[in-house]
Regions:
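N-terminal strand-loop-strand
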Residues: 1-24
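Structural detector for helix-capping/boundary residues
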Residues: 5, 28, 42-43, 100-103
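Structural motif
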Residues: 7, 20, 55, 71-76
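A generic structural micro-feature
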Residues: 19-22, 67-73, 91-94
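The catalytic Nudix box helix
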Residues: 25-58
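Active-site-adjacent beta-strand/loop module that shapes the phosphate/pyrophosphate-binding cleft
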Residues: 61-86, 98, 103-104, 121
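Nudix hydrolase/Nudix homology domain
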Residues: 84, 91-126
Length: 126
């Protein structure tokens, strides 16, 4: 999610099995029969309590997953517009959310280092 040159990130709860306590983008896992876009809308609603109205695909990150011997695929989107007010912490999956400039975002301890390249692309585009 982006607004006024800032990106919204969430700090993962310490009890999370993967990437506890680090900053992450808003997102989650596909459910059976769900499209990637439907997953995006559902996860944003669940995690920050707003409904995406306008979004665009950015790309994918493939991360090795030794637990299932198959890569974990992250589909990245930019949410440009939403309804439902200000994004707010709406899930126990995270302990806090915040808006960050490019310089701030790339300096954070992130779940995936590849996010930095996406932040640069999104925030440089305005």
């Amino acid at each position: 999610m982006v607004r006024d040159g800032l990106v919204l990130l969430a700090r993962r709860s310490g009890h999370r099995r993967r990437y506890p306590g680090v900053w992450d983008v808003i997102g989650g896992h596909l459910e059976a029969g769900e499209s990637i876009e439907e997953t995006l809308v559902r996860e944003v609603e669940e995690e920050v309590g707003v409904t995406p109205n306008r979004f665009s695909a950015l790309g994918e990150i493939d991360e090795p997953n030794p637990e299932i011997n198959d890569p974990h695929v992250y589909h990245l989107f930019t949410v440009h517009d939403w309804s439902g007010g200000e994004p707010r912490l709406a899930s126990d999956e995270h302990t806090e959310i915040g808006w960050f400039s490019l310089a701030e975002a790339v300096a954070l301890d992130l779940a995936l280092p590849e996010y930095r390249d996406y932040f640069r692309r999104v925030l440089a585009a305005g």
